[in-house]
Amino acid sequence: MALSKIDAANFLTGTIPQGNVANASLGAVTALPAAIPTGKVLQVVTGVTYTTTTSTSATYADTSLTASITPSATSSKILIITDQFMRKDQNNTYIGYKLFRDSTELNYIGDLIAYTQNSDSDANGIGTTYLDTPSSTSSITYKTQFATLSGGTITIQADASSGNERGRGTMTLMEIAGW
């Protein structure tokens, strides 16, 4: 059996003759054909809240974090990214966290544990990333809700390290061209 040696350093060198390329150079390509979906971002909306919400209940309540967007096409998708902080007041406190489009529940994150080795207050980040297909060109409002699933007290938009009730919650909505 014959062995061949391939010089990998020079294997992929060279040029394509200009006559074989439709444009003068690949750098001159400015657009893809319409049949190729690009998934480009059409608009970005951000919602911010500093409002503190506290609960000791297993009944879900709004966190005060909302953002609204009006998609430009029914084929668009909406990428939702939320980022909030919560504080619990005792060890082994479980939290439930939900994302809604108007009144429709989209995403549920349940049994998140806010755990420390002692019963001291502890702050943790909480959030979600979700790709929605609303199939609408009407205004849409997204919001988050939370509940305490195991007793104890949960405070959203809380900063335990400074001992105050301030914190920032953000929601970013990105309309992505449909594909």
List the predicted regions and their residue ranges.
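Short, solvent-exposed loop/turn segments enriched in Ser/Thr/Gly
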Residues: 61-63
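Terminal beta-strand-rich extracellular "head" domains
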Residues: 48, 52-54, 59, 70-179
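Glycine-rich, low-complexity segments
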Residues: 1-52, 178
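Extended, low-complexity regulatory regions
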Residues: 65-67
